[in-house]
Amino acid sequence: MKINTQDLLKAGVHFGHIARKWNPNMRPFIFMKKGGIHIIDLSKTISKLEDACNALKKTVKNGKKILLVGTKAQAKEKVFVYAKSINMPCITERWLGGLLTNFTTIRKSVKKMNNIEKMKKNGTFNTLSKKERLLIDRLYAKLYKNLGSISNMNQIPGGIFLVDPNKEKIALTEAKKLKIPVFAMVDTNTDPSNIQYPIPSNDDSSKSIDIILRFVSEAIKHSISREIKNSINKKL
C-alpha cells in the first residue's frame, strides 16, 4: 500500500494545533503557520511513516507482538478494529498502571479470565451454585473490560504504538523504562524526542488516525503473511 500526499491531505493529517500550543522540538516537522495553526510537512510524515512501518515489519518478523494504544474518543474504535484485524493486542480503555512494568501480575489476571472462559466452554461453570456463577460473572466482566483486548499478549510486546503520547503518558513512561520501542503519532504539541519512531500527524481527527493506523496495520499484516508463507515453504 503506497503512501501518497493526496491521501494524507484528504484525511487532514497535515493540520496541527494552534501555534501558541506548539512544542519547539516539532520545528523540523512543521511546514508553515496558517491562520494561527501549524501545518505539518507531509513529506516528513511520509518519510517517518515509512521508517516506522519498516521497523514494525522487522519486529513482527521476529515473532513479537505490537501493542496498540488509543484511549481517546476519536481513537478507541479505530484502534480496536485495526488491532483485531491483525491479531495484535490493544488498549482502548483506561491504561492499567503496571501493565508493562508489572506484566507478570497482569498476566496472572489474564490467565484467570481465560480460565473462566474455559469453564464456560467445558460446562464446569454450569455445575456451580447460582451465587458462585454470579460472583464469577462479575469478576469476568471486570477482567474482560480491562484485559480482554490483550488476552493474546503472552509476553512483553516488541513495540508499542501510541495514537497520542500526551494522552498515554503512563504507557509511554512504562515502555521507556523497559526500553520497548515506541511508535507514535506526534502532533505539533507533542515532544517527539521521547519517541523512537515519531510520525508527525494530526492525532485529533478520526480520519487522520484512521489512515495512519491503516498504513501501520498493513505493514504488520504484510510481515505476518510473509512469515506464514516462509514457514509453509520450509515444510514443503
Residue map of PLM features:
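Long, charge-patterned amphipathic alpha-helical coiled-coil/hairpin "stalk" segments used as oligomerization
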Residues: 86-195
